[in-house]
Structure formats: structure tokens, C-alpha cells
Amino acid sequence: MVGWKKKKLCRGHHLWVLGCYMLLAVVSLRLSLRFKCDVDSLDLESRDFQSQHCRDMLYNNLKLPAKRSINCSGITRGDQEAVVQALLDNLEVKKKRPPLTDTYYLNITRDCERFKAQRKFIQFPLSKEELDFPIAYSMVVHEKIENFERLLRAVYAPQNIYCVHVDVKSPETFKEAVKAIISCFPNVFMASKLVPVVYASWSRVQADLNCMEDLLQSSVSWKYLLNTCGTDFPIKTNAEMVLALKMLKGKNSMESEVPSESKKNRWKYHYEVTDTLYPTSKMKDPPPDNLPMFTGNAYFVASRAFVQHVLDNPKSQRLVEWVKDTYSPDEHLWATLQRAPWMPGSVPSHPKYHISDMTAVARLVKWQYHEGDVSMGAPYAPCSGIHRRAICIYGAGDLYWILQNHHLLANKFDPRVDDNVLQCLEEYLRHKAIYGTEL
């Protein structure tokens, strides 16, 4: 009788344990269904994309963490201890990673899916607002393949369209590596016409014009065109760019100011091009159509209608032809067209509408001769990196200031000078793209 009772109790215990296991299984199943998130098939239409759990999984798959020895959260907030540590870290040669080579990209792009996954490209639109507002890019490059790939990754979105112009003079392995990278994306292509780019000559403008023609012929209904070079990097997410471009309401944004007397000499004489650009004693005729000349820089944020008029409007084409033999025409062609009354999105030539590079959103640059004590009226503090052609190549100490500005991109970055600032910027932008919040 006692034995039978023990068996009954034992059987009851087993049933209780079995019931607990079944309950746990049901709860686990429900939780797994609730938190099911197939990152590989995640897209904008998926309900899962809106869940915090899926956002976390997506971020874990796509995050671009900087090396552990630097505190990017502190650097982006301007914490001086974190900045000093990053600058000291940058001085240690043994910690510097050699840049990825042309051969690396030629090998990894043999499997495009592996390349995009390993290099962590975002492969679907992150919002409907971004999907409905595609952006076009003209990317002019000539060296440093890793710089190009990291820039492309930072600005890449599948709804956008990207034209890449490679300098004809670039090494063949570099050109092949660029082709290999862009072959992995249906919305990235090589410009149909490539030119040899000579510093400060017309060829820099021609590279952008070639991309403009190709981009207008694409099937993507892009709204704005941004032009970039290999030392640029975005300081806004794609979503932030879309918002900023919408706020322009069809206007363009680029530097356009009255030229100094020294800059007027850039179009006073005819220039010749060999391997370099040199002036002649031949005086040029005045600008066509009595246009007042303005000066700016090579970078612009231009509406599609503006781009169309650059290529098709007879008055625009007369100015284009006139500036071809000037010095650094990219620094006065766009600035002058931005003040031409027939150009869509332009502004009047009146002094009230002069726009500095700090006011325009196209590009954030620190010029050496403007750096100084901000409390004494300087526009910005000294560069924490180094200078090249009087332009700051940013260091980690510049990042907090960079992120306080309204520009879409900044120039110049070079991982050989300071890779910490780029790593932190990549980590910051990727976190903000996925979560919409800062680090």
C-alpha cells in the first residue's frame, strides 16, 4: 500500500514536471514568435522592423564599432579626456592598421553578398520618407580605395543613385577595384566618359558634368545632386539629409560670394593645361551675358532642375564654355550660376544673398587662415589634425565641433592622418541611422 502511494506521488511529480516543461515550451514559442526577426529578409514593409528587438538585432548586424581603446561616445560629446586619449592613441604607430588594398577588394567582391554583409552596407530603405526622396551622388575619386569604399558605405542607400568618376590617370588596379566594388550594386555605376583630372583645371568640372549627364538619363527620379571627392565624409544620416533637402524647397545650397581682387585674376587671363595648369599673357573677354562673377568652392547641393539647366540652357552653356580656360573653374562656375536669374533654385546677385561656406549646407571645411580663438571672433578653433593646402585634415578633437554644424558633408578626412575620427564618425552615423538617436 505504501509502495503504491509512492508510485502515485512519483507519477504525479513527473506529470507536474512535464506540465512545467510544456508550459515553458509554449511561453518560449510565443516569445520567439513575438520577437521573431529575420534580419536577412527585413525590409521597410515588415512590421518586425518597427520593433525595438528587431532594431537591436539589425544594429548588432550592421554596427560599425570603433576600436576599444577609444571612447567615441565621449569624443562626439566633446569630452576632453576622451579626445586626448584618442589623439594619444593615434600617435602610437603600432596601433595603426594598414589600409585595405586594391587586391583585398578585388578578392572579396568576387562574392558580392559576402562583401556587402562583411562590410556592413545597409541594403534596404530605413524609412518611407527616404524611399520617396532619392538622392543622386557624383563621386570623383583617384586614389585610396578604402577611403572610397568607406565613403560609399556611409552615404549608401538602395533608393539613391551613384555615379563614380575615376581619374583616367589612376593606377589600373585602383580602377579595377572601383569597378569590382560598384559591380555589387545595381544603383552604383561608373561614369560613361572618364577624363584625366588635373588639379585646378577644367577637368575637375568635366568629371561632374559627365556624371550629371549620366544621372539625368537614369531611371531613378532623384531630387537633388550632391558631389563628393575621396576626402569627403557625411556628417548627417541619409534621413537627416532628406529632411534638410526638403527644407530647401527646390533651392540650391552652395557658397557664392563676391570675389577678392586676387581671385578675379583667375578668370582675367587664359590658362593652358599640360601636366599642370599655367597662366598665359592672353587676356580673356568679359563673361558672357554681362554676368557678374561670384566665387565659392567645388561643392554644391543642386536641385535636379538646376542640373538640367546647367546642361541644356544656352546661357548656362555659354558660361560653361567661357570658364574652361580659367584657373580652378569649379570655384566660380557653380557660384556664378547660383546667382544667375534663369537658373532654377538660384538666388539674386544682390549682396543680401551672399552665402559663405559656413552658411551653405554643401561642405564643412576648416581653413587654416581662419582658425583661431573663437572667443575673439574666429569662426572656428584650430585644427586638431594637420593641414594640407591650408585645409584641415580633421583629427578626433574636431569631431564634436563638426557634429554641431548643419552641413551634410565635411572635408577633409584621411585615415592615414587620423583614423580615430573616421571610426567614431562611422559609429555615430550608423547608430543614429538605426535608432534615430546619438551615441
From Swiss-Prot:
One of its GO terms (molecular function) is N-acetyllactosaminide beta-1,6-N-acetylglucosaminyltransferase activity. One of its GO terms (biological process) is protein glycosylation. Keywords: Disulfide bond, Glycoprotein, Glycosyltransferase, Host Golgi apparatus, Host membrane, Membrane, Signal-anchor, Transferase, Transmembrane, Transmembrane helix. Disulfide bonds join C72-C229, C163-C383, C184-C211, C392-C424. Pathway: Protein modification; protein glycosylation. Its main location: host cell. It is a single-pass type II membrane protein. InterPro entries: Glyco_trans_14. Residues 1-11 are cytoplasmic. The chain crosses the membrane at residues 12-29. Its EC number is 2.4.1.102, 2.4.1.148, 2.4.1.150. GO terms for cellular component: host cell Golgi membrane; membrane. It comes from the Viruses. It is found in: Host Golgi apparatus membrane. Residues 30-439 are lumenal. Glycans are attached at N71, N107. It catalyses: a 3-O-[beta-D-galactosyl-(1->3)-N-acetyl-alpha-D-galactosaminyl]-L-seryl-[protein] + UDP-N-acetyl-alpha-D-glucosamine = 3-O-{beta-D-galactosyl-(1->3)-[N-acetyl-beta-D-glucosaminyl-(1->6)]-N-acetyl-alpha-D-galactosaminyl}-L-seryl-[protein] + UDP + H(+); a 3-O-[beta-D-galactosyl-(1->3)-N-acetyl-alpha-D-galactosaminyl]-L-threonyl-[protein] + UDP-N-acetyl-alpha-D-glucosamine = a 3-O-{beta-D-galactosyl-(1->3)-[N-acetyl-beta-D-glucosaminyl-(1->6)]-N-acetyl-alpha-D-galactosaminyl}-L-threonyl-[protein] + UDP + H(+); a beta-D-Gal-(1->4)-beta-D-GlcNAc-(1->3)-beta-D-Gal-(1->4)-beta-D-GlcNAc derivative + UDP-N-acetyl-alpha-D-glucosamine = a beta-D-Gal-(1->4)-beta-D-GlcNAc-(1->3)-[beta-D-GlcNAc-(1->6)]-beta-D-Gal-(1->4)-N-acetyl-beta-D-glucosaminyl derivative + UDP + H(+); 3-O-[N-acetyl-beta-D-glucosaminyl-(1->3)-N-acetyl-alpha-D-galactosaminyl]-L-seryl-[protein] + UDP-N-acetyl-alpha-D-glucosamine = 3-O-[N-acetyl-beta-D-glucosaminyl-(1->3)-[N-acetyl-beta-D-glucosaminyl-(1->6)]-N-acetyl-alpha-D-galactosaminyl]-L-seryl-[protein] + UDP + H(+). It holds the Pfam family Branch. Non-essential glycosyltransferase that can synthesize all known mucin beta 6 N-acetylglucosaminides. Mediates core 2 and core 4 O-glycan branching, 2 important steps in mucin-type biosynthesis. Has also I-branching enzyme activity by converting linear into branched poly-N-acetyllactosaminoglycans. Contributes to the post-translational modifications of structural proteins. Belongs to the glycosyltransferase 14 family. Was acquired from an ancestor of the African buffalo around 1.5 million years ago. This is Beta-1,3-galactosyl-O-glycosyl-glycoprotein beta-1,6-N-acetylglucosaminyltransferase. The gene is Bo17.
